[in-house]
Amino acid sequence: MRHRVKRHRLGRYGSHRKSLLRNLSREIVEHGSIVTTTAKAKALKILMDKLVSKAIEAATTDDKAKSVHLRRQINAVLGDRRLTNKLVDEIAKNYVGRHGGYVRVLRIGFRRGDAAEMSLVQLVEASSQEG
C-alpha cells in the first residue's frame, strides 16, 4: 500500500529520476524557461521552489557559514558552481520578500508524436511579484 507516500515517480528508478530533475533544474536556471511534459514540470516545480528558497536565504543572510552551507546544498543538486552562483547572486535577488511560487507551469498543448501533454516551465518575473 502506498498510503501517505507522495512522490512524482515519473516511471523511472531513483537515480534516473534524480538525474532527470537535476538536468531540468540546471536548464531552467541557465535559460529561465523550458518546455517539458506536464508530469515532469510538476515534479520540477517542487524542486525549484525549494532551491530558490535556499538561494534567497543564502543571499540575504549575514552569517557567512550559513550562506556557504546553503550554497553547498544548492550546488549538490545543480552540480555546477557557475549555476549556483547565478541562482544565488542574480535570480534570488528578484524574489526577496516573496514566499513561494517562484516557478510557473503553463500548459501549452499536446506533443504531436505521442500526444503527451506539454508545459512551459518558467521562473516568475520579478515585476509580476507585486500585487
Swiss-Prot record:
Q: Please indicate if the UniProt record lists Ribosomal protein as a keyword.
A: yes
Give GO terms: molecular function aspect only: structural constituent of ribosome
Q: Record keywords: Ribonucleoprotein included?
A: yes
Report the InterPro entries cross-referenced here. Answer: Ribosomal_bL17, Ribosomal_bL17_sf
One GO BP on record is: translation
Could you name the domain of life of the organism this protein comes from? Bacteria
Q: Which UniProt keywords apply?
A: Ribonucleoprotein, Ribosomal protein
Recorded GO CC terms? cytosolic large ribosomal subunit
Query: Entry's Gene3D superfamilies?
Result: Ribosomal protein L17
User: What's the subunit arrangement here?
Assistant: Part of the 50S ribosomal subunit. Contacts protein L32.
HAMAP family assigned to the protein according to its UniProt record, in alphabetical order: Ribosomal_bL17 (MF_01368)
Write out the similarity annotation.
Belongs to the bacterial ribosomal protein bL17 family.
Query: This chain belongs to which protein, by name?
Result: Large ribosomal subunit protein bL17
Q: What organism, scientifically named, is this protein from?
A: Thermotoga petrophila (strain ATCC BAA-488 / DSM 13995 / JCM 10881 / RKU-1)
